[in-house]
Amino acid sequence: MATYARSVERLIAELSRLPTIGPRSAQRIAFHIIRTRKEEALALAEALREVKERIRPCRRCFNLTEGEECDICRDPRRDRSVICVVEDPYDIGPIERTGEYRGLYHVLGGALSPLDGVEPEDLRIAELVERVRSEGTRELILATNPNTTGEATAMFIAQEVRELPVRVTALASGLPVGGDLEYADEVTLGRAFAGRREL
């Protein structure tokens, strides 16, 4: 027997499918939505609809954008000879907030994880290698997460571009092992960029 009305149970179930949202958090969010004014709840629903209709990957770096290219790729002030490789679009925000980096990005779409069935062809590694070849990239900064899958991904990419005339670096230590870039504070991340090491 359901505890709540069918529509409430459905909302809780859908919210529970989001990453890091368990059943109790989903229930709290659902009841928060129910308590808000109708206009606020509908604004949230409209924002969800809009993002699903408008957002797509940048054709160049695979960051999120509403157009063909993201704002970073379109910015003529960016250093086009340097590409920072990240796992996911949400890794770009913390790096940008450091103010230490003015190059371009490449979003892989995850990290290698054979146990989870994520192989090199499942990521945008081939597209990265092609960019390095065709865009005259001088430096490739591998800013994958400091965990087992991130490190394996960085080492794989370093091997893939070893014959190309590009400097390959990784962020310096200071980031917690096993952590994710999205949770790193700007000072630590800025120092990791400033002290990056050759691979």
Curated annotation (Swiss-Prot):
Species of origin: Rubrobacter xylanophilus (strain DSM 9941 / JCM 11954 / NBRC 16129 / PRD-1)
Function: May play a role in DNA repair. It seems to be involved in an RecBC-independent recombinational process of DNA repair. It may act with RecF and RecO.
UniProt zinc finger (C4-type) residues: 58-73
Domain Toprim: residue ranges: 81-176
Protein name stated in the entry: Recombination protein RecR
SMART domains, per the entry: TOPRIM (SM00493)
Family classification: Belongs to the RecR family.
Swiss-Prot/TrEMBL GO biological process terms: DNA recombination; DNA repair
GO function term, MF aspect, one: DNA binding
Keyword DNA repair: yes
InterPro entries: DNA_Rcmb_RecR, Rcmb_RecR, Rcmb_RecR_Znf, TOPRIM_dom, TOPRIM_RecR
A Pfam family hit: RecR_C
Keywords linked to the UniProt accession: DNA damage, DNA recombination, DNA repair, Metal-binding, Zinc, Zinc-finger
